[in-house]
């Protein structure tokens, strides 16, 4: 909270959602599930019916997760104009289609209509805030708050400002998303595609190469991920996974021992040069994540979580099989 913000992140009560498609509607569902009042606007003629249908479809999942006190679909209000949507907002989430000209104009309109001191975030997945904030009169309060679909179930939000964004707005947005139950990465600089999408895109491109060359089928690729690294990445991520691959020597041993394999023809992506500086940054970063835990502790944690994920998937699969059997009876 700084003198520039109208309210503290924890005191937010009303969120304006501009754009009510798949991402915008997912945000609406998430904010409602967290107990906020949501005012939504979308220029499409059938926007309200589609939005309420999306929220209704998402609500059982939100109830299973455990909604916040006071959470209700009745807290959604859909209005006819952008000005109405943002008039009393404590925070604005923009989720318009991915067209740069549209984003520039819309963010300028939102900025002009939104009360002073209210942070405005864009859900963009493809543009930098530096590109989008050029038409705004007060660009300092504009940031990116990039979610993953569906926003009401996938917790990650990547927050980053543009060249004209002010630090207080980036920090305020990060704190607000955390208060709203999200897992937040506050990026220190703009990066095309952000972080999660770049990692995801690397795997996706390699999958396309393997299919194109007849090396693997779509089914094999998906099975390789869901029954292999995907299970571990659900809770440790690639860096901590490779740290454990180094045994007691951790990331340092893994890089020193297996570093040359980066030059092996296992991917079409060109590997970075494993310089001493890169090695040291990887080791130091991993040490921060490990935070003093021993390899034995990490292995025990990994195994518990693998078992929990496997059991949860088995339970869901049994329930789905029972539903199919009941439908066929």
Swiss-Prot record:
GO cellular-component term (any): cytoplasm
GO BP: carnitine metabolic process; catabolic process; fatty acid metabolic process
Main location: cytoplasm
Its EC number(s): 1.1.1.108
Protein's cellular compartments: Cytoplasm
Bridged cysteine pairs (disulfide): none
Catalytic activity field: carnitine + NAD(+) = 3-dehydrocarnitine + NADH + H(+)
Associated pathway: Amine and polyamine metabolism; carnitine metabolism
Keyword field: Cytoplasm, NAD, Oxidoreductase
MF terms (GO), sorted A to Z: carnitine 3-dehydrogenase activity; NAD+ binding
Family indicated by similarity: Belongs to the 3-hydroxyacyl-CoA dehydrogenase family. L-carnitine dehydrogenase subfamily.
UniProt xrefs under PANTHER family: 3-HYDROXYACYL-COA DEHYDROGENASE FAMILY PROTEIN, 3-HYDROXYBUTYRYL-COA DEHYDROGENASE
HAMAP family: L_carnitine_dehydrog
Function description: Catalyzes the NAD(+)-dependent oxidation of L-carnitine to 3-dehydrocarnitine.
Complex formation: Homodimer.
Identification of the protein by name: L-carnitine dehydrogenase
């Amino acid at each position: 909270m700084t003198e520039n913000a109208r309210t503290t992140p924890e005191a937010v009560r009303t969120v304006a959602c501009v754009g009510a498609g798949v991402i915008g509607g997912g945000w609406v569902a998430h904010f409602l599930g967290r107990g906020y009042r949501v005012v939504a606007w979308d220029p499409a003629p059938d926007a309200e019916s589609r939005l309420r249908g999306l929220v209704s479809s998402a609500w059982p999942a939100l109830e299973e997760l455990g909604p916040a006190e006071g959470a209700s679909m009745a807290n959604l209000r859909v209005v006819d104009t952008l000005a109405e949507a943002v008039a009393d907002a404590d925070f604005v989430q923009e989720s318009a289609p991915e067209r740069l000209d549209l984003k520039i104009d819309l963010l300028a309109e939102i900025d002009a209509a939104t009360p002073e001191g209210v942070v405005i975030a864009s859900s963009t997945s493809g543009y930098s805030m530096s590109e989008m904030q050029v038409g705004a009169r007060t660009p300092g309060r504009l940031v990116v708050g990039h979610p993953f679909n569906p926003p009401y179930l996938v917790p990650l939000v990547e927050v980053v400002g543009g060249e004209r964004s002010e630090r207080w707005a980036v920090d305020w947005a990060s704190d607000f998303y955390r208060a709203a139950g999200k897992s937040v990465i506050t990026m220190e600089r703009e990066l095309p595609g952000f972080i999660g999408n770049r990692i995801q895109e690397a795997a996706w491109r390699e999958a396309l190469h393997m299919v194109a060359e007849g090396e693997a089928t779509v089914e094999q690729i998906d099975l390789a991920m869901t029954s292999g690294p995907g299970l571990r990445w659900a809770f440790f991520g690639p860096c901590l996974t490779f740290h454990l691959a180094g045994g007691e020597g951790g990331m340092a041993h893994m890089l020193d021992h297996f570093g040359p394999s980066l030059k092996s023809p296992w991917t079409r992506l060109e590997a970075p040069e494993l310089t001493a500086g890169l090695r040291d940054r990887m080791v130091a970063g991993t040490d921060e994540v490990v935070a003093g835990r021993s390899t034995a502790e990490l292995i025990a944690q990994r195994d518990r979580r693998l078992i929990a994920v496997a059991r949860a998937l088995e339970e869901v699969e049994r329930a789905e099989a029972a539903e199919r059997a009941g439908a066929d009876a």
